[in-house]
């Protein structure tokens, strides 16, 4: 389903395709974590610093990097946990390490995001890029997240499958052009980590709300990520099962802020929307399907202190 706004009679602007808004932390899987894992920089249980840090470059150089609820926990945390709590400090550290390893500030965009249809923009190379400062559309985010759900393969979103004339002759037929962006191993690690984001509920109550509406639907294998921007001007939630990816953005057209309950409203809206679709067609979400780790992924016991 495509919902471009609250009331088409009042406003015909399609927010799903045309509204360009800052992605907030919802960009982190595609820009930071996926590329870092693919490059061999880290694994899901590697440790990253969440100690207080300051911006090194840009107009905010010397100012503290701020997480949603603190200026750092002054600890090290696993990569998985840093995604669960959406640590801006940890994500920035990973992004900087990726720069140093690959020697290119545009590495993540050139090798990954550009292949998933994200718009070209100088801000992808900013130190603050992991905080989601680049404007994207809901369609961009849906396409990006479905790449992980599709074993690392990007399939461009489309609406029209085919067009036929009155005689039944096919005038147009959509042709898929899949692009392998991430390896199957990386994609499976990312879905495993994003499952923790939804299950642990440190940034969204979506899991509880959807489970309360329908137990079977709540027990689907949900993975996803949240995002918000300054003053809650933008609130994002993108979720996937092995069958479908759904993205949600909410905010004001005039870019004014909202309030700290924005994430709760987004979780509620998404849960109720998904439940309504599910009650209409229970096959859509593949509630009995599960994401599996690729056979190429190696499991090992790691130290809680060193990763």
What residue ranges belong to the model's regions?
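Active-site SXXK
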Residues: 22-48, 82, 144-148, 190, ...
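A penicillin-recognizing enzyme superfamily signal
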Residues: 1-19, 137-143, 147-307
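Gly/Ser-rich catalytic serine loop of serine hydrolases
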Residues: 18-27, 133-136
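A generic secondary-structure signal for well-formed alpha-helical elements
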Residues: 39-43, 55, 90, 98, ...
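Short, conserved helix/loop micro-motifs enriched in His/Cys and acidic residues
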Residues: 14, 119-128, 216-219
């Amino acid at each position: 389903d495509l919902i471009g706004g609250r009331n088409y009679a009042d406003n015909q602007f399609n927010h799903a395709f045309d509204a360009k808004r800052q992605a907030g932390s919802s960009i982190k899987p595609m820009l930071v974590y996926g590329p870092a894992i693919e490059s061999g920089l880290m694994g899901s249980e590697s440790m990253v610093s969440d100690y207080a840090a300051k911006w090194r470059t840009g107009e905010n150089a010397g100012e503290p990097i701020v997480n949603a609820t603190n200026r750092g926990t002054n600890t090290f945390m696993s990569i998985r946990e840093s995604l669960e709590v959406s640590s801006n400090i940890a994500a920035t550290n990973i992004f900087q390490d990726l720069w140093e390893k690959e020697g290119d500030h545009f590495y993540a965009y050139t090798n990954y995001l550009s292949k998933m249809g994200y718009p070209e923009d100088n801000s992808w190379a900013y130190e603050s890029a992991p905080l989601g400062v680049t404007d994207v559309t809901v369609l961009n985010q849906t396409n990006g997240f479905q790449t992980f759900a599709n074993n690392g393969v990007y399939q461009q979103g489309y609406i029209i499958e085919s067009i036929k004339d009155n005689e039944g002759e096919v005038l147009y037929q959509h042709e898929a052009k899949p692009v392998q962006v991430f390896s199957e191993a990386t994609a499976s690690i990312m879905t495993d980590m994003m499952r923790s984001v939804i299950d642990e509920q440190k940034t969204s109550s979506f899991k509880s709300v959807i489970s309360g509406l329908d137990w079977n639907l709540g027990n689907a294998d949900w993975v996803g990520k949240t995002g918000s921007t300054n003053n809650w001007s933008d609130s994002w939630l993108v979720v996937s099962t092995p069958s479908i990816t759904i993205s949600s953005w909410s905010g004001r057209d005039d870019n004014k802020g909202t309030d700290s309950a924005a994430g709760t409203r987004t979780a509620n809206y998404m849960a109720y929307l998904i439940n309504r679709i599910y009650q209409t067609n229970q096959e859509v979400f593949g509630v009995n399907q599960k994401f599996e780790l690729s056979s190429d992924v190696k499991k090992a016991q790691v130290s809680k202190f060193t990763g």
